[in-house]
Amino acid sequence: MKKKTGQLYEGAYVFSVTLSEDARRKALEKVTSGITNYGGEVLKIHDQGRKKLAYTIRGAREGYYYFIYFTVAPEAISELWREYHLNEDLLRFMTLKASAVKEVLEFATLPE
């Protein structure tokens, strides 16, 4: 039997700033356990901290940003998205196919 290999993805997740540190850790764990529950593997998590949002989302002006590199079967992505939509702690998410895991993320500073 041929072993399935997963596609590499980069996920961007923005969590509510109203969460305590412990609640934020649990919300992030909920996202990562969802990936592993569908047979995926979390490769790298980048915590980008608290940042200002480009626009208001559900009354929030700021959010906690995380970037997660993971592998999972492509057919599992739609199920993960369904779970993300039901997660009230998650303000926004985006999942993209990735070509490689970035060890360091660099962003240009935007003028205020």
Curated annotation (Swiss-Prot):
Name this protein carries in UniProt: Small ribosomal subunit protein bS6
Gene Ontology molecular function terms on file: small ribosomal subunit rRNA binding; structural constituent of ribosome
CDD domains (UniProt xref): bS6 (cd00473)
HAMAP family (UniProt xref): Ribosomal_bS6 (MF_00360)
Role, per record: Binds together with bS18 to 16S ribosomal RNA.
Gene Ontology BP annotations: translation
Signal sequence range: none
